Amino acid sequence: MKNETYVRAFYKTGVYVAELIEMQEENQRALVKVLAVLRHPTQGDLHNPKMTNVPFFHQRKALAQFEKTWVPLSSLKSYDEQVPDYKTSLKKALEKQISELESQDTDWSRACLEKLKECQNEYGL
């Protein structure tokens, strides 16, 4: 992975195309700069997945374009395809997740859809 410029980075529940900025093998982490969104983060309480009866049902936004973040080295994979446009990829990832949730009829999916619609408005999509 040392010579990779672009990587697929998993951060919390989102997946991103990112530029590899720095690797710290001794700390098992890498600094990446977000270029595109492949999977929008899952909404809700990560410690109680698919549950709505939790103290706080989190809204989780995608990392912003060019945002830098540390990710575990184990979460990186090489990315050899053309890097998509950030806004286009964000819209596609969000629409895919909304579509998947609309096909479900649960309290959790409805709560997620509500949070995703808020994200959609805040993103200006």
Question: What kind of feature is each model-predicted range?
Answer:
Residues 1-11:
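Short coil-to-beta transition motif at edge beta-strands of beta-rich domains
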Residues 12, 35-37:
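Histidine- and/or cysteine-centered catalytic micro-motif in compact active-site loops
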Residues 15-25:
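Short beta-strand-centered aromatic/proline hotspots
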Residues 111-125:
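Glycine-rich, aromatic-bearing surface loops/beta-hairpins
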